[in-house]
Amino acid sequence: MYGKIEKIHFVGIGGIGMSGIAEVLLNLGYKVSGSDLRGSDITERLARLGAEIGIGHKADNLKDVDVVVISSAVHDDNPEVVEAKRLHVPVIPRAEMLAELMRMKFGIAIAGTHGKTTTTSMAASILGHAGIDPTIVIGGKLNAIGTNAQLGQGKFLLAEADESDGSFLVLSPTIAVVTNIDADHLDHYSGGIEEIKDTFVKFINKVPFYGMAVLCLDDPNIRAILPRVKKRYMTYGLSSQADIRATHVRHDGFTTSFTAHFKGYRLGEISFTMPGAHNVLNAMACIAVALELDVPFSAIQEGFSRFGGVGRRFTIKGEPRGITVVDDYGHHPAEIKATLAAARLGWPERRIVAVFQPHRYTRTHELFGEFVTAFYDADVLILTDVYAAGEQPVEGATAERLSQEILRHGQKDVTWIPNRELIPQHLLGIVKEGDMVITLGAGSIWQQGEALVTLLEKTS
């Protein structure tokens, strides 16, 4: 960045996407300040690294700042945004700051409706073990490094590209990965899936002539846009038509294995510790990126074998009394189906107890019918009220109505518990040895999983 920029302020610095960029900037030597509505382990970490953290949004938080960075959740009436404009301090979206960091490196952007965080994390493990040492910005905590960002000494920047508000179009990556295209964030994409597909086409075609797009051929919406892709691309999938292909896929508990092929040539075996057929696809995207960067296949294998997972993606919270408690960020019907299918594949003999907190009224409303049929792999389902994420209620978009419709569509053991604080005690009365309890949602439901672990340990 131009030398006169010294201090950068983040409104909503505790967010997983904002904090990663803030940490990289701190490590680059910039002064960083930020505010959030409440403190967290993220804000505490940033404070230890030297950031000035304010709790609550107020004009006084802007002290000698040169630019203000905001997320899509921050509105124009935020007091810090109002003050910045009064002081004629530039206010930019998070994606624009990420684009500035990417401009200084060769960018690898992982996009797609689902699987971005896991794919980016896997790629970070592979490239790190290959000696490429990328700068990374991830939307989840990479277990191997204990954080969601790292300043590397290499020439690449590896980051998630968030499509939720279309701002990923400001990025200009050298390598662009698209894992899938699905209907989500319909509050922004009023034109539905066709507008979403159009936006991804624009994103892919921003790749330079010397770059590469990596696209999942198994995804029908990606197949639909292929004729409109103008840049060089590589495909991956289970399909025999894919450039990177997986065969002989095996699932054994947390371990997933498959044989990787490139354009008909057998590369070798891949194995990693993360369950689910969807993660086979995520892994193949990483293989494609690594091959494009001339990473030896032996280093790819090593990177996968050392992959330690990422926070809130099928994360074990504890196994007291023979009951496995897992937390997963899945909050879209497709993600829920994939997570529950992963549990069913890896542990076919176990009873699966799913605990779901819908995230956002708009998503619950727009995808209501898909949510109704998303839980068939769960033996027991508990729903709690919607995590609003700052939204106002939408008529009919309630967990109570969702539970009723799920029952009407043939699922038998469904319970609505509006107060999530009561869920751990309810679970204590129904779970038994051998069960797998999975908390699902992008809100606060992970806390109930942790509370259940504590209760089970106390009563063991």
Swiss-Prot record:
Transmembrane segments: none annotated. Keywords: ATP-binding, Cell cycle, Cell division, Cell shape, Cell wall biogenesis/degradation, Cytoplasm, Ligase, Nucleotide-binding, Peptidoglycan synthesis. It is found in: Cytoplasm. The keyword Nucleotide-binding applies. This is UDP-N-acetylmuramate--L-alanine ligase. GO terms for molecular function: ATP binding; UDP-N-acetylmuramate-L-alanine ligase activity. GO terms for biological process: cell division; cell wall organization; peptidoglycan biosynthetic process; regulation of cell shape. Pathway: Cell wall biogenesis; peptidoglycan biosynthesis. Cell wall formation. It catalyses: UDP-N-acetyl-alpha-D-muramate + L-alanine + ATP = UDP-N-acetyl-alpha-D-muramoyl-L-alanine + ADP + phosphate + H(+). ATP binds at residues 112-118. Pfam families: Mur_ligase, Mur_ligase_C, Mur_ligase_M. It comes from the Bacteria. Belongs to the MurCDEF family. One of its GO terms (cellular component) is cytoplasm.
